[in-house]
């Protein structure tokens, strides 16, 4: 893909980089094996801080690399969707952030001629009750003005941080919502 924005009418050929910054048990069950937990939030709660930091660092350093961005572009893609958790900035105790990986992704994508669609994949209290929402069996986010405000703030911070980066395509507000009473 040529550098610059995707144009009106230009076909988007993209891939999702799931399970990198938001863990999804069905994609890589081994990362959950020691704890037996069903989702990322409970994995974080069940794992000691130093162990969790080491586990996430090992996973994030190796699961998606600069070579993957080059390979994706070489296969004709022009966009990657990157799911991020609501604790992306590392400001939620017990949940290590991942902006350094997202920063690297933006630089790798730009070098490879790719655009990025950031996807806020989890929100406090979960938006769908599935592992991809971070918290299995719970859908409370939309009942909490505080949680909604927090998610909106994360989106605003992501927009401020990446708005001028040449690789930014857009930001997906909240992924896979299922707003039902719980």
Residue ranges with predicted function:
Residues 1-77:
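N-terminal carbohydrate-binding accessory modules
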Residues 13-15, 80-82, 116-118, 171:
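Hydrophobic faces of well-ordered beta-strands that scaffold small-molecule active sites
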Residues 21, 121, 174:
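Catalytic metal-binding/acid-base residues of hydrolase active sites
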Residues 25-37, 96, 126-142:
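Aromatic- and acidic-residue-enriched segments that line the glycan-binding/catalytic groove
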Residues 60, 69-74, 96-121, 133-170:
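An active-site-proximal structural segment forming one wall of the substrate-binding cleft
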Residues 75-96:
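Aromatic-lined carbohydrate-binding/catalytic grooves of carbohydrate-active enzymes
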Residues 84-91, 116-135:
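Aromatic-lined carbohydrate-binding surfaces of glycoside hydrolases
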Residues 177-182:
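Conserved small/polar residues in nucleotide/adenosyl-binding loops
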């Amino acid at each position: 893909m040529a550098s610059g924005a995707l144009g009106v009418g230009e076909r988007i050929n993209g891939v999702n980089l799931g399970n990198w910054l938001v863990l999804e048990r069905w994609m890589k069950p081994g990362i959950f094996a020691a704890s037996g937990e069903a989702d990322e939030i409970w994995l974080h709660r069940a794992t000691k801080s130093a162990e969790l930091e080491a586990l996430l660092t090992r996973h994030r350093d190796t699961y998606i690399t600069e070579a993957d961005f080059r390979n994706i572009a070489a296969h004709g893609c022009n966009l990657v969707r990157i799911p991020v958790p609501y604790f992306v900035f590392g400001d939620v105790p017990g949940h290590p952030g991942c902006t350094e990986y997202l920063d690297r992704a933006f630089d790798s994508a730009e070098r490879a001629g790719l655009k990025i669609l950031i996807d806020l994949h989890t929100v406090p209290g979960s938006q769908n009750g599935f592992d991809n929402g971070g918290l299995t069996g719970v859908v409370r986010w939309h009942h909490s003005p505080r949680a909604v405000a927090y998610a909106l703030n994360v989106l605003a911070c992501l927009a401020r941080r990446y708005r001028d980066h040449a690789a930014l395509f857009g930001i997906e507000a909240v992924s896979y919502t299922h707003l039902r009473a719980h």
